[in-house]
Regions:
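Phosphate-handling catalytic cores of nucleic-acid transaction enzymes
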Residues: 1-291
């Protein structure tokens, strides 16, 4: 429809170049108003790399509130720490993690409102980057670092082979099929609500009690992260449920929750390692090594 209106507007403007016509001027104004009321369609963005919080808010607003920040470097943390400003701006990241509405009103651009933002971040960074961000009191104090799931794979240096086999084609094809099926899911006006089956809820309740005891005994190392742990397991369960693609089924099974718990235990151990070693005092780190 925009293209048709643009053609009409262009045609009327050409006619008005040669002579004035009040009726045509009114028609032109009406067509321009109609064109302005039609939202501009932009290509969908799925990924972003290094971008400021302001740019991230804009990308979320232009993409239905969803986006992934995927980077193989830690530059995004420099930006968050205030590379382009004197202070760290973490609000968009914090709100997009839990789906809180984002409302931005600034003189320099149009107001932006995102009712249900959803941001995914996948960052592969060197340990020294984690050292720096773990020592950043703003990121720690605002709870940004407690929202990440950490993984510390064992270094393979010294055991690598020159001719490393690639990812099997069958695995690549299945992964590609899964991603495209997920992307094809219709985005409704309102988010779908997932619920736990009775058994799944009982499993989570029991594990919650167990984790609370863990918080007392060992959670002092990373209390902010550990406090969000059960919530992270429920998020993982939701992702697994979506990946299973049971159409029209909004109930998460006990089997799915069990898988989510196993994944969660992996991240619990690795995140505990991150908090106990990254950004720690050098002398404390040496003492832990000796111990």
């Amino acid at each position: 429809k925009r293209e048709a209106l643009l053609r009409q507007i262009t045609g009327i403007k050409k006619k008005l170049e040669s002579k004035e016509n009040r009726e045509m001027e009114l028609e032109l104004q009406q067509l321009e108003d109609e064109l302005e009321a039609i939202p501009v369609e932009k290509p969908r963005r799925f990924f972003a790399d290094d971008c400021s919080s302001e740019a991230l808010t804009n990308l979320l607003a232009n993409n239905g509130g969803t986006l992934s920040v995927i980077s193989s470097e830690g530059g995004i943390f420099d930006i968050l720490a205030g590379r382009y400003s004197s202070t760290a701006n973490l609000d968009t990241w914090l709100k997009a993690h839990c789906g809180d509405p984002i409302s931005v009103d600034r003189m320099s651009r149009e107001a932006e409102y995102i009712s249900n933002p959803c941001l995914t971040a996948i960052l592969t960074v060197q340990p020294n980057v984690l050292d720096c961000i773990m020592a950043n009191t703003t990121m720690v104090g605002r709870g940004l670092l407690a929202r990440f799931l950490y993984s510390f794979p064992t270094s393979r240096i010294g055991t690598r082979t020159f001719r490393t086999p690639g990812i099997p084609k069958e695995v690549r094809d299945k992964y590609r099929e899964l991603i495209f099926r997920l992307m094809a899911l219709p985005m409704g006006e309102e988010p779908q609500t997932l619920v736990l089956s009775q058994r799944a809820e009982e499993m989570i309740a029991d594990y919650f009690e167990e984790h609370e005891q863990f918080m007392v005994e060992e959670g002092q190392i990373f209390p902010d992260w550990a406090a969000k742990y059960i919530g992270a397991i429920l998020r993982i369960a939701g992702l697994l449920h979506a990946a299973d693609m049971v159409e029209g089924e909004n109930e998460i099974s006990a089997e799915t929750v069990g898988r989510a718990m196993e994944i969660g235990k992996y991240f619990l151990a690795h995140s505990m390692h991150a908090y106990s070693t990254m950004g720690a005092d050098v002398n404390i780190a040496k003492a832990k090594f000796v111990w």
